[in-house]
């Protein structure tokens, strides 16, 4: 996409999976119009052990994957640089350096997304970052 194409960019539960999250943020900001808004809902999933399902309901989303698959997911996750970052502090610092300002952050979004412990429940606390691209 050309520079400054979009008014809003929204991402949910994606950033933590990217091999180069800073590069993705840079690209998102490039295609965002000056004054445009970036909304990112994510979590510090890298800090959690996916193979530990003790706190999850019996019918959680990953129940059918099995222990081997969950261990493989854990090994892949450990290879992602973002898994070692302190988030969302890293996100805010990175976005600030790339030209995002006027931040708001919501650390309580999980309680509104996961209102009950059902098959979609995830105990990792989500965060929501909203920021505006500098108007230049």
Language-model-detected regions and their locations in the chain:
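Conserved class I S-adenosyl-L-methionine
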Residues: 37-69
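Short conserved loop adjoining the S-adenosyl-L-methionine
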Residues: 1-3
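Short alpha-helix
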Residues: 82-99, 105-106
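Core SAM-dependent methyltransferase catalytic element
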Residues: 98-100, 115-136
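Short catalytic micro-motifs in class I SAM-dependent methyltransferases
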Residues: 13-14
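A conserved beta-strand element that flanks and buttresses the S-adenosyl-L-methionine
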Residues: 10
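A short glycine-rich, Lys/Arg-flanked "PGG" loop and its adjoining helix->strand segment in the class I
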Residues: 22-37
């Amino acid at each position: 996409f050309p520079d400054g194409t979009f008014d809003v960019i929204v991402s949910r539960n994606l950033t933590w999976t990217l091999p180069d999250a800073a590069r993705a943020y840079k690209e998102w900001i490039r295609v965002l119009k000056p004054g445009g808004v970036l909304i990112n809902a994510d979590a510090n999933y890298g800090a959690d052990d996916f193979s530990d399902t003790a706190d999850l309901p019996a019918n959680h989303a990953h129940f059918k994957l099995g222990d081997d698959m969950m261990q493989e997911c854990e090994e892949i996750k450990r290879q992602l640089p973002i898994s070692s970052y302190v988030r969302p502090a890293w996100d805010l610092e990175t976005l600030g350096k790339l030209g995002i300002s006027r931040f708001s952050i919501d650390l309580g979004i999980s309680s509104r997304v996961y209102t009950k412990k059902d098959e979609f429940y995830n105990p990792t606390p989500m965060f929501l970052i909203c920021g505006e691209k500098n108007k230049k």
